[in-house]
Amino acid sequence: MSAKSFEVTDPVNSSLKGFALANPSITLVPEEKILFRKTDSDKIALISGGGSGHEPTHAGFIGKGMLSGAVVGEIFASPSTKQILNAIRLVNENASGVLLIVKNYTGDVLHFGLSAERARALGINCRVAVIGDDVAVGREKGGMVGRRALAGTVLVHKIVGAFAEEYSSKYGLDGTAKVAKIINDNLVTIGSSLDHCKVPGRKFESELNEKQMELGMGIHNEPGVKVLDPIPSTEDLISKYMLPKLLDPNDKDRAFVKFDEDDEVVLLVNNLGGVSNFVISSITSKTTDFLKENYNITPVQTIAGTLMTSFNGNGFSITLLNATKATKALQSDFEEIKSVLDLLNAFTNAPGWPIADFEKTSAPSVNDDLLHNEVTAKAVGTYDFDKFAEWMKSGAEQVIKSEPHITELDNQVGDGDCGYTLVAGVKGITENLDKLSKDSLSQAVAQISDFIEGSMGGTSGGLYSILLSGFSHGLIQVCKSKDEPVTKEIVAKSLGIALDTLYKYTKARKGSSTMIDALEPFVKEFTASKDFNKAVKAAEEGAKSTATFEAKFGRASYVGDSSQVEDPGAVGLCEFLKGVQSAL
């Protein structure tokens, strides 16, 4: 692939501004990277989002009959909880509830999940639907992480959007969320790419040579299921490698959806960004031929185009939706639904939908009163602020001191940024100590949750932010009055609530080779003994045990064996706790 590319300054904001200029019925809130449209007050609004670089996903599918809004982060990075919560506020102003349709990537799930929790705490009717349709990472490798999200997500946007437009006033948020699950349960997708994409502002890098390509490469340049060497013909790629991964009923690792002989099937061929329309049309034709010849499947509807990209990714994906099984599942709960195809083909004016009809509507105005950037919590639990500040400083100093070691570990099992991310997190605490509530621990912890998310970003920021948000909520539940002093017993109970809250948004558990392997033993030991020293020792033992585990979560779960190396996230947490311990 050529390393040449068009580069602009501030590419994400420039792209959003250009999109809004070309689509005047959609409003852009530049400082929040939010785009939204008008929504009827008796209907459920849909919001999606994630990292930039997949256009027209997500903003391109804002329109009547599809999404009500989208919120995006930087390139390949989840938007923050603040952004998402503000998007919820804006869209909910003229809706009866909000469904967040989230691609199954850890950072997205954590940040959108935390936003939904905070929205519900504000009295907003809000739920999350997590979508995953990829078959490249099968059940064995995907484990508890689940399937990655690919272009099939757009079919969820379209079908659920049509349902929300027509029926959500009757069936509400729960009914709309159920439709999303039904469609996701009947979707399978696999992608292939000749090379990595070129990310704006970064040097092009690839492990593939001119004679290699990758089967199952993800939309963020993640590894696929197999490197093909030499590159097969396009016909062989489709017939011998891609379709069997979607349709082989004997492949128990990937047979996520059953296709019977008489089932109606929708075919979506998606351009990952760098393939010409001419070639995509040819690929669509060949795919249809092989479906008929090898599987006796004649798609009842075929969609081809550029729906979910990876910048200029020189590849494509194939998605199959079992329309028959989806229709039957829908009909069991929604008597009005005659066919899922009616929802798929219902009117939309979303600019990115390839078979849309367009109608001009005026853009909504921004209600600035709904945009908030301060996190607040019910004020309970008095505490010694000066001691607390010293503990935080000592913990931060220990993490900063240990950063080279943490980075060395992460270079072996991850992407090498864990140490830097943790340092950014602890600096986010120490640099904002003067802003913390000195009268209420619940409010102070909620503020720290916000500072950490803003300074760390990514998956780690989401995990720690949710954990601390849960701890704040635990203090609110356990403390009997605003002025009750926080004791070890209160902290212990609140930590248990915090851990339970975190477990709502990650499937990682002890034994998964993550920071949970240090966190859970710490919480359990402190809950049992109320002894911080014993709890730190339990955390250290948990971190050491990760050297014997295979990673099941995060980027390390997609690469090779990581045995004999302690998980850097677990080690980083222990270093912080040891720093606090030294200041007690």
Curated annotation (Swiss-Prot):
Catalytic residues (positions): H220 (tele-hemiaminal-histidine intermediate)
GO molecular function: ATP binding; glycerone kinase activity; triokinase activity
Pfam family, one: Dak2
Residues binding ATP: D415, G416, D417, C418, T459, S460, T514, M515, D567, P568, G569
UniProtKB keywords: Acetylation, ATP-binding, Glycerol metabolism, Kinase, Nucleotide-binding, Phosphoprotein, Transferase
Pathway participation: Polyol metabolism; glycerol fermentation; glycerone phosphate from glycerol (oxidative route): step 2/2
GO biological process: anaerobic glycerol catabolic process; glycerol catabolic process; glycerol to glycerone phosphate metabolic process
Entry EC number(s): 2.7.1.28, 2.7.1.29
Residues with the N-acetylserine modification: S2
Domain of life: Eukaryota
Database matches in NCBIfam families: dak_ATP (TIGR02361)
Miscellaneous comment in the UniProt entry for this protein: Present with 23600 molecules/cell in log phase SD medium.
Protein name, UniProt field: Dihydroxyacetone kinase 1
Gene that this sequence comes from: DAK1
